[in-house]
C-alpha cells in the first residue's frame, strides 16, 4: 500500500482546422511549403509572429483530415504519501497547480515528458489569448483541464 502505480489512456480532442484559426487551410499549405523550402522570408510575418504562424500552419496541415482524437497515456505512482503524475508533453503551470491542489497528499510531483512528447498543454485562457503554444498545440482548448481531471482520478486510484 505504500507503493503503487496506475496508468490510463485518455482520448484527447485535437485542434483540427477551424474558423477561429488566423489562417485558412489553403494559406497554411502555402506557408508550410515556403517554410519547408527555406523561404520563410516570403511569409509576411517577422520574428516570433513568423514562428507562431509557421507552427500554426504546420498544425493545420497535420490535422486537416483528422484524427479528431489522439490517445494519450497518463501515469501515476506513489511512494507513501507522495504522488507523481506522468504527463507526455509540456503542461502549463496551471496543470501542476491543479494536480497539487488534490487533497490527501503530502506532496504531488507532476512529471512532464513522461513516455513521450506530444507538445504543449495550454490552459483554457491561453487559447483565448492566442499565443504561440496554444496556436501550435495539437489539442483543443480544455486539454490542460482534462489532464488535471484525469490526473486526479489516477491519484485517487493509485
Where on the chain are the PLM-derived regions?
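Non-catalytic substrate/cofactor recognition surfaces at enzyme active-site rims
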Residues: 1-158
Amino acid at each position: 500500500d505504500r507503493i503503487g502505480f496506475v496508468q490510463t489512456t485518455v482520448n484527447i480532442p485535437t485542434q483540427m482546422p477551424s474558423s477561429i484559426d488566423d489562417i485558412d487551410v489553403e494559406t497554411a499549405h502555402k506557408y508550410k511549403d515556403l517554410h519547408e523550402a527555406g523561404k520563410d522570408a516570403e511569409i509576411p510575418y517577422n520574428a516570433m509572429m513568423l514562428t507562431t504562424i509557421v507552427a500554426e500552419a504546420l498544425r493545420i496541415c497535420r490535422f486537416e483530415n483528422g484524427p479528431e482524437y489522439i490517445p494519450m497515456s497518463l501515469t501515476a505512482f506513489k511512494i507513501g504519501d507522495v504522488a507523481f503524475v506522468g504527463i507526455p508533453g509540456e503542461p502549463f503551470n496551471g496543470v501542476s497547480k491543479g494536480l497539487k491542489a488534490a487533497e490527501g497528499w503530502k506532496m504531488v510531483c507532476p512529471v512532464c515528458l513522461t513516455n513521450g512528447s506530444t507538445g504543449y498543454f495550454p490552459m483554457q485562457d491561453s487559447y483565448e489569448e492566442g499565443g504561440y503554444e496554444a496556436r501550435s498545440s495539437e489539442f483543443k482548448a480544455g486539454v490542460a483541464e482534462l489532464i488535471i481531471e484525469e490526473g486526479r482520478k489516477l491519484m485517487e486510484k493509485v
